[in-house]
Amino acid sequence: MASTIQMFYIARFTLPNVYVYHGRGTIPNTYPNPKGTLDMTKETVLRKPEAMIFDMDGTLFQTETLLLPAYHQLFDTLRAEGHFEGETPPEERMLGSLGMLLEDIWKVVMPEASVAAHRRADELLLQLEIEGLDGGSSQLYPQVKETLKALKEQGVRLFVASNGLEDYVKGVAFAHEIMPLFEGVYSAGQYKTPSKVNLVQILLEKHRIQDAWMVGDRSSDVEAGKMNNQTVIGCAYAGFGRDEELAGSDVLISDFTELLRLYREAE
């Protein structure tokens, strides 16, 4: 596992439902107010996209259903192999670090451990997650598969762009039987991109897409969409915390199925 690959994410954001105004696809936008919180005051008119690009973790996939069991198994193995001593670090430390480079994640989660322990943790995490996917206990968010099918039936081209490793991202899509719905599944692990901005740029250029919605739960998704001049739909339904995470999104949704309504009401 290359140390330069960015780790997958869990959404960390809570906000009330986005209110969708009827007619002409007009919806409240989100902008930081002077206190740094999000304000639902400015309106945006959405255009129907030719494609939607989805983040995987915290957007389509409930990452914690796979990550947290693997996290505890990982530390059991590290202790057994002599790479780590003491209690397993709090889950919150791991969850709060997701989205960083893997090498930086372990510096936060177990700063006292050796570089060898960090690299072994890289290997174990991917291994345990692939095994967990085979075990069938992980979950997509409610109605994700059905919503994706409905969007595809309406002619929307569907893609994934994730900062995770290739085997992990595609493994999630295959395990949950959504892989056939996507025209392309892009990952930092496959393309060795330094940021999601670059990954989305590659996707857009390769498939000659001019108008897309970037759908995701993290600031990197907002950045990837905006830096590539695309609309950003912020996913605020996983409930893990930083208020500023999705600042700059064109729309916030609190349920994945809201995408169908937004698409239907867009111009």
Protein language model features and the residues they cover:
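Structural recognition of alpha->loop->beta junctions
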Residues: 177-186, 244-263
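Acidic, Mg2+-coordinating phosphoryl-transfer loop and its flanking beta/alpha structural elements
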Residues: 214-251
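N-terminal helical cap/lid subdomain that shapes the substrate entry/recognition surface
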Residues: 45-142
